[in-house]
Amino acid sequence: CNDTILKNMNRRSNRAELLDVIGKLRREIPNITLRTTLIAGFPGETEEQFEDLCNFVKEVQFDRLGCFAYSAEENTVAARMDGQIDQEVKDKRAELVMQIQTGIMAQKQAAKVGQTVRVLCDGVDDESGLYLCRTAADAPEVDGNVCVSSEEPLYPGEFYDVLVDDSDLYDLYGTCLLYTSPSPRDSTSSR
């Protein structure tokens, strides 16, 4: 991010303050998942300022990130600013940020292989037979799944420990290790 652009956006912090807060969060909560949404192509954004944004993304290594091309909203200060950027340039900049994030995500996903994660079961995928689960870091309908194979049935709304065997850009794949809570349908069952 760039201090001039942050100021023009009427943000109350600067790059150094943001990096400081992010550093404190990571020191205090080592397994924290950091997510953000960015805007590329804000009015007046120069190539150098855009490079600052790209470098910020590379430095911070967000766990989840979305980047959108700036779009003028009617009756806003930004819509009346000089230096409106061509839509094609804005789209290309947003795409470049997402390409950087794709590389970061691939590394972060691959690093989870071999780890045990706690997941919440959302249900089963009828096509693959795998259980669709998510970690505490995953937003439903936004983030990927932890696709779980299990010798025992898993129940929606219940938590399980899963060994991550594989990953792709968005999803993790694993095997259920521990059945941590009984099914609400059968409180006497033993798994």
What are these regions (language model features)?
Residues 34, 106, 110, 189-190:
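Secondary-structure boundary/capping residues
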